[in-house]
Amino acid sequence: MLLCAALQVFPYILRATLFLSMTRSPTAGIVRRPFGRLADGREVDQFTLCNGRGLELSVIPLGGIVTALRCPDRDGRSANVVLGLRSLDDYLLRNHAHVGTIVGRYANRIAGGTFTLDGRTHALARNEGKNTLHGGPGGFGSRWWSIDALPLADDGCVAVELGLVSEDGDQGFPGRLEVSVRYTLTLLDEWCIDYRQTLIPSPLI
């Protein structure tokens, strides 16, 4: 059950924490399972984190998509509490609403698919008529993210870290962007999301 959400913003660091109420269940750890295959033959694996108290988070490298967040109710019955699709094909063909994805380089739409920065106008790839939505047709939500399962922390936290490099000119945006997103489940039944990026030079994000 979602109790509250806290959001803290720092320069180039964003951390969101969701606090959930649950009961103790299986051992903490990370399980990797096949989720599907892309047209180019790449296998897509799903990483499922469990904090040992019943909170489970599943994520895939395509778009950094969170496919499920399962937690038990007061009677111990587990349920997925985030919107998700049924299969990899659904995410590839029907995810027009960007369900579960990491949005970038820019969230929301840029009217006309252009913007001016430091006196220079940048023309962007468009994917909503004349507009650029959520980073364009090749935005972060459709990209392949690396996923590293991190060792179990001394405090019992379970985490994975996703990484992506967006080169200068990607979708028309200036500057090279190195971004990482860490998903952590804690023994306090929190799902923590940490965003970090390195900007060379500082582009629009």
Residue ranges and their predicted role:
Residues 10-12, 19:
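Aromatic (phenylalanine/tyrosine) cluster motif
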